[in-house]
Amino acid sequence: MDRIRIVGGNKLNGTIPISGAKNAALPLMIAALLTDETLILENVPRLADVALLQRILGNHGVDIMSAGKRPGDREHQGQTLHISAANIIDTTAPYDLVSKMRASFWVIGPLLARMKEANVSLPGGCAIGTRPVDLLIMALEKLGAEIVIDGGYAVARAPQGLHGAEIEFPKVTVSGTHVALMAATLAKGTTVITNAACEPEIADVADCLNKMGAKITGAGTSRIVIEGVEKLHGARHAVLPDRIEAGTYAMAVAMTGGDVQLQGARPELMQAALDVLIEAGATITQTNEGIRVQRNGSGIRPVDVSTSPFPGFPTDLQAQLMALMTRAEGSSRITETIFENRFMHVQELARFGARIALDGETATIEGRPKLRGAPVMATDLRASVSLVIAALAAEGETMVNRIYHLDRGFERLEDKLSACGATIERISG
């Protein structure tokens, strides 16, 4: 199993190209199921989750061709995928694939809309009554689907096709919004989604769907209106830059000090995170190429932050911010309001000497002037990269184990950091 070795203490200086957003690329790939023509997606990141979704779509009979730079090439370029779902041969998404990635459950919407049926395994680890898929299923039922849970599968049918509906989510749900949006494009009549998630990735998916012939307005706001159409066609679309990746590297620069250009990053996608970084002592400048992040001389200032849906501070940057605050000059508080049990990185950060106390969904971090390198273990995607950020500033050597989590969401992380002066390497085996 691969590991990452880091020797801390180097400032980061240079340019980091920002990859396409995983959280847009996955639903965009799934949207290809809505048409029998070819969807061409540019700037798709080379990630383990993208490769897994290719396998899942292939199981349905989808043909995918890839072009672009190969892993290991020094020059960054996202791959281009040509996705053709002309011949869907199977509407079942089996447990052995869906259990590996929750977002793969989203195929239920496009399959139901186009094929009028879908049998999709429930994602692993979903307790009855607290499943994130409950709101998603509710939305599809509003659109006229008949869905029963049988043997761990959502068995969905819409013999007469889907119809427009008023869908009001009781709480903001990214997955529910994505699936309702995709399914409603082929429904008869008008669908109105209220209390919709406002994430930029949802607006990006809607933009692509409109290029395919959908009639969607309001995506990126809490009220989305979809006029159903009879058929969607092929299109070409470039995945928007990954605001979470950009925010992660920005926090790494704030942690180590230095001066880095985040090439392709868009400040309007991540203003809440940039505001927090400025409060913490970083200098942020918008440039023609993206965003420039600097911290030279001044210390890291403590901040108090609560996660919230877009445009608030994203939960996917919470662990990275906590790593940064371990070296702040004072006490910080971070409250997690989106997900339960998202403080699994606390125990591993403590191995560096971090002082973090938990009280329910709030973490209090007492900043320390120095961290020390240690062997640590990644527990999930965002937690794993927080350990890398801590290691970059720690004295001595750190070995990060179970880095397959990193490969799910960060393209060539060690190459990008190494190019900016970090002492970091992947150790295979």
From Swiss-Prot:
<dbReference type="GO" id="GO:0051301">
    <property type="term" value="P:cell division"/>
</dbReference>
<dbReference type="GO" id="GO:0005737">
    <property type="term" value="C:cytoplasm"/>
</dbReference>
<dbReference type="InterPro" id="IPR005750">
    <property type="entry name" value="UDP_GlcNAc_COvinyl_MurA"/>
</dbReference>
<keyword id="KW-0133">Cell shape</keyword>
<feature type="binding site">
    <location>
        <position position="102"/>
    </location>
    <ligand>
        <name>UDP-N-acetyl-alpha-D-glucosamine</name>
    </ligand>
</feature>
<dbReference type="GO" id="GO:0071555">
    <property type="term" value="P:cell wall organization"/>
</dbReference>
<feature type="active site" description="Proton donor">
    <location>
        <position position="126"/>
    </location>
</feature>
<dbReference type="GO" id="GO:0019277">
    <property type="term" value="P:UDP-N-acetylgalactosamine biosynthetic process"/>
</dbReference>
<keyword id="KW-0963">Cytoplasm</keyword>
<keyword id="KW-0132">Cell division</keyword>
<keyword id="KW-0573">Peptidoglycan synthesis</keyword>
<protein>
    <recommendedName>
        <fullName>UDP-N-acetylglucosamine 1-carboxyvinyltransferase</fullName>
        <ecNumber>2.5.1.7</ecNumber>
    </recommendedName>
</protein>
<dbReference type="GO" id="GO:0009252">
    <property type="term" value="P:peptidoglycan biosynthetic process"/>
</dbReference>
<comment type="similarity">
    <text>Belongs to the EPSP synthase family. MurA subfamily.</text>
</comment>
<comment type="pathway">
    <text>Cell wall biogenesis; peptidoglycan biosynthesis.</text>
</comment>
<dbReference type="GO" id="GO:0008360">
    <property type="term" value="P:regulation of cell shape"/>
</dbReference>
<keyword id="KW-0670">Pyruvate</keyword>
<feature type="binding site">
    <location>
        <position position="316"/>
    </location>
    <ligand>
        <name>UDP-N-acetyl-alpha-D-glucosamine</name>
    </ligand>
</feature>
<feature type="modified residue" description="2-(S-cysteinyl)pyruvic acid O-phosphothioketal">
    <location>
        <position position="126"/>
    </location>
</feature>
<dbReference type="GO" id="GO:0008760">
    <property type="term" value="F:UDP-N-acetylglucosamine 1-carboxyvinyltransferase activity"/>
</dbReference>
<dbReference type="InterPro" id="IPR013792">
    <property type="entry name" value="RNA3'P_cycl/enolpyr_Trfase_a/b"/>
</dbReference>
<keyword id="KW-0808">Transferase</keyword>
<dbReference type="InterPro" id="IPR001986">
    <property type="entry name" value="Enolpyruvate_Tfrase_dom"/>
</dbReference>
<comment type="function">
    <text>Cell wall formation. Adds enolpyruvyl to UDP-N-acetylglucosamine.</text>
</comment>
<dbReference type="InterPro" id="IPR036968">
    <property type="entry name" value="Enolpyruvate_Tfrase_sf"/>
</dbReference>
<feature type="binding site">
    <location>
        <position position="338"/>
    </location>
    <ligand>
        <name>UDP-N-acetyl-alpha-D-glucosamine</name>
    </ligand>
</feature>
<dbReference type="InterPro" id="IPR050068">
    <property type="entry name" value="MurA_subfamily"/>
</dbReference>
<keyword id="KW-0131">Cell cycle</keyword>
<feature type="binding site">
    <location>
        <begin position="131"/>
        <end position="135"/>
    </location>
    <ligand>
        <name>UDP-N-acetyl-alpha-D-glucosamine</name>
    </ligand>
</feature>
<dbReference type="Pfam" id="PF00275">
    <property type="entry name" value="EPSP_synthase"/>
</dbReference>
<feature type="binding site">
    <location>
        <begin position="22"/>
        <end position="23"/>
    </location>
    <ligand>
        <name>phosphoenolpyruvate</name>
    </ligand>
</feature>
<keyword id="KW-0961">Cell wall biogenesis/degradation</keyword>
